[in-house]
Amino acid sequence: EVNQAKINDFNSYDGYSLKYIGKQESISGNLTLAGLNYYDPSAVMTKVCTRAIDESVVKLQKKYEEFKIKTPLFSVEPLTAKIGMKEGVTEKCRYEVLEPVIDENGRTSYKRVGVIAPVGGKIWDNRYMAVEEKAEGSNLTETTFKKVSGGNFHPGMLIREISVN
């Protein structure tokens, strides 16, 4: 149900500010045209642009903390989350599992309780038109992970990509 009063309050509030973080460029390289009508240039351009934008966002996520993916664990048996190749998930990625902790002032902070890694062959290909091109992993609906360290994970705990050297 739409609450028009809340929408109006949000739209009229002038206390929001934006801070420029950075920029990223991307070049569309090896694009598979499978699943496209070759005679429809707008469909080809849409796929090229969408994939390039997704790639740029992934690069921003790797470079700036503000852009890092934070998403809940969807399940724990098996460990899954609703992220995939569109968000830059590869077998080399590592994610910290975060548990919310509420202090005496009611503020929420997050404590690391473990680290997980994507399982090869079980990474969801959720990129634009991956299903149409029959890409590996496009038949999945989430990415499966394995525990690297820690334990006692619960659905809903946040995961966040960490840098691994």
What are these regions (language model features)?
Residues E1-N165:
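Surface-exposed, polar/charged interaction patches used for macromolecular assembly or partner binding
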